[in-house]
Amino acid sequence: MAFEQSPLPFAPDALESAGMKAETFEYHYGKHHKAYVDNLNKLVEGKAEFVGKSLEDVIVMTAGNADQAGIFNNAAQVWNHSFFWNSLKADGGGAPTGDLLTKIEAAFGSYDAFKTEFAAAAATQFGSGWAWLVEDAGTLKITKTVNADNPLTKGQKPLLTLDVWEHAYYIDFRNARPGYIANYLDKLVNWDFVAANLAA
């Protein structure tokens, strides 16, 4: 059975008031994400070891294997993008509340300290990649990954991500990655999704 592109969890124009145009999703979701799905299906076609496997299974199975780098890169990018869409929400951003805020304050000292550290991780990821909030051995941590890599390969639980590939922000912010990061933290973070991941 072929892998399928997950639907956007919002209308393509739903985030325009928060700084992300429908055109961004036309290209980012409609072309980039779709291409990863199409490429993955071509690469695993006829390979019995991938039959019935989830994206997470494929990512873990192929991580670090140079002979299967194409499969890993496309599978991870399919997963990363689906996770990223769910990390976005109209009228999102700002500080979380309740138990999640308590955990962030315990791990980073304050929400503002978390925000500063996350923004720095996203801004300093050289070239293409992702910034993440993860749970690692019961502790919240911020990490970043290059290209298609993701925390699943390190046994970490992803809670939140921000895509810092240039195609993620060039339509809306041109080359101003820091502005894109600040806008995400202030207006777009889906804390309900983060809380659900933490509780899972």
Segments the model singles out, each with a brief description of its role:
Residues 1-200:
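Feature for soluble, non-membrane regions of globular proteins
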